[in-house]
Amino acid sequence: MSEEIITESIVKNFGSAETSVGEKQPKRKRSEVRAEKLKARKLQKAAEIVQKQKENRKILKDVSLKRLSKSLDRSLPSENTIDQISFNHAMSEEDASGYQIGDKHKNLLLYKLSSSSGSVFTENLYSTIQEFLSAQKVDIADSKNTYVFGSTFDKKSHALVKTSDSVRSLKYGSFVKACAPLFRFASGIIKAHAPHFHQALLKLELAPSALRFGVFPNFSLQSVSNGYMSMESNFSSIKYGFVVIIIVGELNDVELKIPAISHSLKLKDGSILVLRSSLLHQWYSLPKQSILYEIRLFAMSSLWHYEKNKSIKIAKKDDI
């Protein structure tokens, strides 16, 4: 069963509604009963596959969440520092089928989905992104192009507000609509592999009339050019949360390096990563004249400082 089917099963198929004790249940058609049984089998199969993925997780015995979370407060590594690190690479068969990396306590750090899992969602997204950027009257290849959408907490007014980029209307609606299936897919992956964090995201109160992107309160779009560091940690979710990264572009020989765990991986159009926020320091290595667009789904760290959101409990060690 593919990851697309796994996620679809998790997102959509949750059995029939409960009925009150003593309430007479209406007679159901055979087709409805068969459909419900099929849903149950899909859910069971999906759960078995998720469990198998967890059991095959590669464990880093010298890495812990506690140590990694402290790296959020450090300065971003320089290009010279990156060059001095010996990076581990995934095998080609692992990259094709997908793999997971965990810390010494088996907590999920990185989930690289199979190389084909996101391509169905990004097939026409490259041109949609370029149309959006052109409408903003910016150079579509400029690595300074960074847009952050959704809710944030304004410390001066002590209120939840939309990010400044959320008010842009030119091509924004068509861009978000094109991304909607991708948002749902990413949310299903989080629900399967980080259920506690998924529930916490659903509980977050957002700015009035602000959109939710799947389960996430924020998403960003960033142009990435040669040797450009990815989004800084102050945009991340809380230390023990997750972000989902989706890569869009006509790519060849693109590498993403993650210094915190000395790991690197190859990227292509439709590559999807689930990443601990503690690992947000990343370094893209692109050939000259190349450009990719990074879509990131996350929860702004400021949201957790809003009074009504402070009470939301986050398990440091999710049941994953």
UniProtKB/Swiss-Prot annotation:
Coiled coil spans: none
Signal peptide: none
Disordered: region residues: 16-36
Cell compartments where the protein resides: Nucleus, Nucleolus
This protein's UniProt keywords: Nucleus
GO biological process terms held by the UniProt record: ER-nucleus signaling pathway
Record GO cellular component, one term: nucleolus
Chief location of this protein within or outside the cell: nucleus
Top-level taxon of origin: Eukaryota
Function: Induces a stably inheritable state of calnexin independence called the Cin state when overexpressed.
Name used for this protein in its record: Calnexin-independence factor 1
Organism expressing this protein natively: Schizosaccharomyces pombe (strain 972 / ATCC 24843)
